[in-house]
Amino acid sequence: MTRFQFHRIAAAVCLSSVLLAASVQAADPIRIGVPVGLSGANSVVAPSVVQSAQLAVEEINAAGGILGRKVELEVADDGSGAVGAQKAFDSLIFQKKVNVLISMETSAARNAGLPILARGKVPYIYTSFYEGRSCSPWMYVNAWVPEQQVPPIVDHFMKDKAAKTFFLVGSDYAFGRGMLEFTKKYAEGKGAKVVGEEYLPMDGSDWTAVISKIRAAKPDALITSTAGGAPNVTLTKQLRAAGINIPYGNLAVDEGTAKAMGADAQGIYISASYVTGIDSPKNRQFLAAMGKKFGADLKTPNDLSVPQYEAVYAYKAAVEKAGSTDAAKVVSALSTVSVEGPRGTIAMSKERHAPLTMYLGQVQADGGVKVISSFKDVDPGAQCPNLK
């Protein structure tokens, strides 16, 4: 063999190795991590969140994936709390090697996971409504904050129900206290008076003492902010059993949870960025696809599961704009992309948060939500001014 032939063969072998490596890399799936409360306070709503993510991934793969790569879901139960979230984040980021985290979680779970997120340097799209002002260079939020959700309920109670006094009830953690802190400030700024404010632990289920205080205070209206679906169920059931029938706004009930609550949920006022009754081609298409995929096992799409569906598409758009799954490039691209989803056009363009159309509604006997009024493109306000 001549030296020339040797070099040609060596070059061919090297080229083949490079092409093979590139082919293998291109075939590697993109992994989306979903840490979510399949147990604990969020167990009522978490299955609907997983279903929405499953549909989005199925649709994307059927259309060719992302940059030609198949997408896979990795779901981890965070137990709806801090300890479980630390385990779930660590497992997904460092063992499963996910490219992104996309999920709805309690604020306790989110806050516990953020330091692990920073260490792993993985993009995170948080899809749960929350108390606001949680900021990380790696996190975006496509759900509502108090500035978007609270005013429609308080304004309606004061204007249409002549409410002058409010009683506030929440779970004793970041979401419960953060939401009601904003509610109190907003209501008092409008001239109302808060005559009581009570909290139970996240896993609290006996509201007897709180209900006694509500009776004694005789408020014109009640607003609650509890942790996930389970506390909503117990609190509302006990309120109804006690005969508390004043105007009742719940800052943590979604349409899916309302259906699970049965007759007890009837009459509750909610403020949400999604209701199944949104009359748009995208929403009708989404609901039809969910029904076709899950049939009798379908969990009612809601204000926690629909942002999950849209977030998967937002990640797809960011990766395609960045031209790769490189974490820093994707994080940079996320603020510049928008998606057309069941809620309309969603862009996380305002300090890592999204302007949203909000719907004030009241739960009906069948668990559905009757829309009273809507508010287009409500600004999230100043959430993370140091992050653009």
Name these PLM-found stretches.
Residues 2-5, 9-16, 26-388:
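Extracytosolic ligand-binding ectodomains
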